[in-house]
Amino acid sequence: MQKREIQVMIKSTKTKNQRRISLMDYCIRKLLGLTEENFITDENWLETVTENHEIVHKVKGTWTNTCTSCPYCSSKNVIKHSPMEHKIRIPHLYGNKTLLELKVQRFICKDCRKTWVTDCPLVPKNSNISYDLACQIMLYLKENFSRKTIAKLLSISDKTVERVMKKFKIKTMQRYNYLPKVLCLDEFRGVKTQQGKMNFICLDGENHQLIDILPGRTLHELISFFMKFSRKQRLKVKYLVMDMNASYQNLIKAVFPNAVIVVDRFHIVQHINRNFNQLRVVIMKQFSAKSTQQKTLKRYWKLLLKSSDELDEEKLRYNYHFKTYLTQAQLVDKLLSFNEVLSDAYDFIQELRKAYEKKDYEAFMICIKEIPKQLPYEFKKKFEVFKRFKNGIYQAFTTGYSNGAIEGTNNLIKVIKRVAYGYRNFENMKLRIKIIKGCFFTPVNRKSL
């Protein structure tokens, strides 16, 4: 009895170890993403070698399946044939390149003598990139990495990254079945095309979702693009947020009859500061290069663009140009004393900016109409654009819409271009921008990869 109990205990312990090894093997296969029942690992299924001064892990296994009829002649006279070996790229193991050396079962038809292999769900047909590695490539493409960097991280080629990127469908607003209430329009310097150096971009002004990117910004291209949307959708657009571009005004008459223009508030301030800055440069160059006037007007130009209410009137700092202690307000007074025209222009833009900050449309337009006569003609002429866009400025003061989101997208595009060292193909740039912006992209079914 005691011997029999010992034998039973030994047998039970052996079975437990076998189960433990089997469970461990399954967990390792689960980490590798190789849990299919038809995948059978070899006895020594993991091998580590060095190729071209690089550590490579090789996972060895066999893919078995059954086949009852010939796909060519439908004959039932089918037998197994010698397996076909495939080297499949899978995600890195311990940060090193990993290959799956897979033997796929082949079959031969005795009637037509044709051979074929069974389908393997680990890899697309006629490809050596596994589905898991393709998904990992897309995760990297979602981040702002260059294609060559992704290829280096995953031990693949740049063209492989490009092919995988193009095999993913992008759900965009190009279905032409929806337009938002607020439409933001702008242009950016992207890829030089036949239409020009500038590309067009538009997005939803409320949820900041990218709508589309066009290779050109001409009026004919914009009208032909937006006319693809139904009239019902085009009538839903109530506001067009844009800079002071005259060509965009014609879009309202031709495409969006119910929309009104909203001038972006940033461009209003930018136009004011730019005009004053150009006048400052003209006046500065009237003085000699080594004079205190030119040096100080050139050095402290930011103080002249600063709001007078934000100037420090208490803290004294030594100024080596004037050899005395001055506050910011006193320094600005010194600069304005160099030229009377500069002083009048400064007072004018300060009144204009105060009206802008208070969103007082009437006071803003009164300042434009009553611009001082002693100011140069070129300076006054540049403010005539506010009269042409007075309705858009009114909407900018009364509504809260702006092009802040689209300007941020333009900055993101600059970063994408800089990381990629520029783009030569417009479609590749457009696709990458939409992937990084998360424009409703979803991968297609595994079998279509």
What is each of the regions a protein language model found here?
Residues 2-3, 7-11, 87-183, 187-194, ...:
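Short, positively charged, Gly/Tyr-enriched micro-motifs
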Residues 2-120:
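Short, conserved DNA-binding cores of transcription-related domains
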Residues 10, 63, 67, 72, ...:
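Acidic/histidine-rich catalytic cores and adjacent linkers
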